[in-house]
A protein has these predicted regions:
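C-terminal functional module detector
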Residues: 1-187
Length: 187
């Protein structure tokens, strides 16, 4: 696998803060970092106030416990993901037959029958390709999700990097158009 790495997000707020969440999000820039000046326009006539600008990237980590050791163990396993602003929940398992996984037994059977995101499938099934179990939750105060995609990356026989994007779940009763594309849901 040429792309064997995990991705996390971290803030891109220009305040020198290591992290931010709702209760301590000071703004994107140092000049909107206190409540007294948060309402002021900071760039020309644009209404770019601190409260209206999203927080930076966020790291999602599937740790067994909320301890330093378990969080770092999840980083090493690459059982992590990144999101920007919205607090989207994502968990993915891969295996050769995950058809018995349901919402209620998702984690138990995911770990038992497959490997979590960031893991390696130990052997190749000659009878079928891998299957995936994916659980996604939108931010409770955010917009509805448009779709879930899996991006398959590989190196071809000529040594060139390739990718294919698969739409695996989407909102509403949309269908693919004649070119095989799915129109965005829009907001």
């Amino acid at each position: 696998n040429p792309y064997k790495f995990g991705l996390i997000g971290s803030t891109d707020s220009h305040t020198s803060l290591a992290s931010a969440e709702e209760k301590n999000f000071w703004g994107k820039y140092s000049n909107d970092s206190t409540p007294e000046i948060k309402d002021q326009d900071i760039i020309g006539d644009a209404n770019n106030t601190g409260w209206s600008m999203s927080a930076g990237g966020l790291a999602g980590v599937w740790a067994k416990e909320n301890t330093r050791d378990e969080i770092y163990a999840a980083f090493k396993r690459k059982e992590v993901y990144a999101t920007t602003g919205p607090r989207i929940g994502v968990q993915v398992f891969a295996g050769w037959d995950l058809s018995d996984i349901t919402y209620k037994n998702f984690q138990d059977l995911g770990y038992k029958l497959g490997v979590p995101m960031g893991g390696d499938l130990s052997s190749i099934s000659k009878n079928s390709g891998p299957s995936f179990a994916i659980k996604v939750a939108k931010d409770p105060i955010g917009a509805n999700l448009d779709r879930v995609q899996i991006v398959k990356g590989w190196i071809d026989r000529d040594g060139k990097s390739r990718e294919k994007i698969y739409d695996v779940a989407w909102s509403d009763d949309r269908d693919f158009d004649s070119s095989g594309q799915l129109e965005p849901v829009g907001n």
